[in-house]
Amino acid sequence: GFFRNNYIYMNNLQTIIKLNTDPETKDRYASLYGDNNMQIAVAEIVKAWVFQLLTDYFGDIPYSQALDIVNYPQPVYDTQKAVYDGLIAKLKEAQTMLENSTTDGFETGDVFFGGDLSKWIKFANSLRLRLALRASNADPSYLTEAQDAIADGVMESNDDNAMFRFSSSGTPNEAPWYNGFY
């Protein structure tokens, strides 16, 4: 279901990170898909988004040991606060990585923002803002994080929305729900 499938999906994102950090593969993936740090940052942002959905839905979840099945075949459940703190830190790291990246080669592979790194930064900061506002209900000290996220730039209009646009008829991602079930 929802819980298991999201961890499977995040393993794909973790593979992107591994391929872009492994000395044996990182040059190849940079030449194919653009700056390594940019790819890592985008994967971390999407992972943060999915982890946030999971912890908001289930509360305590595997986070710190998740996605490392070799070393942690039964990962511990982290508290929601620990997950939120970890996600905020990862989103800040991703923002810094994007600010120091180039878009060369990424434009065609970016199905969310077409290679626009400024929109990825806004998305990361908007996720930080959402995490901080939700956590501030339990701990008002998170309001400082919310203010920092706003100052760093967040989504302000529908032009900034993160969405996957399906391709036209006959292309690989045409109607994936229909194609997956019929």
Label for each model-derived stretch:
Residues 1-64, 68-105:
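Conserved, well-structured interaction surfaces
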Residues 50-60, 138-140, 152-160:
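Secretory-pathway/luminal and periplasmic proteins that interact with or process carbohydrate-rich
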Residues 70-71, 136-138, 161-162:
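Solvent-exposed loop/turn segments at secondary-structure junctions
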Residues 80, 84, 114-124:
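Aromatic-lined, polymer-binding surfaces characteristic
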Residues 108, 112-114:
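Asp-box/WD-like beta-propeller blade repeats and closely related beta-sheet repeat scaffolds
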Residues 141-182:
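Hydrophobic-face positions in mid-chain alpha helices that act as interaction patches
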